Regions:
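Charge-rich amphipathic alpha-helical interaction elements
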Residues: 1-137
Length: 137
């Protein structure tokens, strides 16, 4: 097939079905995204809280006489960063962020689909108007 002779066929019924289905699907994505953002915010708070608890624990080891030498700030930071609970909380945060990014991409895809359907609908109306006016002469 020669690319210069390509003709796009617009199926009016399929386009109407897509236009009818789009708002509900879009609303579902928006709802999922809102929930995912809440999960992400909670995960951020969880990371902060766990980091605080672990840091406090590391500082209390010296205060309570469990370790003889006062830990340096760098040593405390390293212990916090390597703590399994901190790592698990950060992994949960990354998972929550990933879900948000994917849903934001899905939302953008629906926006593009809506724009495309509006453009196709306008193109179809213009073609019908052209046929009406050319046939009226």
């Amino acid at each position: 097939m020669n690319n210069n002779n390509f003709v796009a066929v617009i199926d009016s019924e399929q386009m109407k079905d897509e236009m009818a289905r789009l708002p509900g699907e879009y609303a579902s994505v928006i709802e999922e995204l809102a929930k995912a953002r809440v999960v992400r915010a909670r995960a951020e708070q969880e990371v902060k809280m766990i980091r605080f608890v672990v840091e406090k624990h590391e500082r209390d080891l010296f205060k309570n006489g469990i370790v003889d030498k006062k830990p340096t700030e760098d040593a405390i930071k390293m212990e916090v960063a390597l703590h399994p609970k901190v790592k698990a909380a950060q992994e949960a945060l990354l998972d929550a962020e990933e879900k948000c990014y994917l849903l934001e991409a899905k939302k953008e895809a629906y926006n593009c689909k809506r724009d495309m359907l509006v453009s196709l609908s306008a193109l179809q109306r213009a073609e019908l108007d052209t046929l009406r006016f050319s046939g009226a002469r």
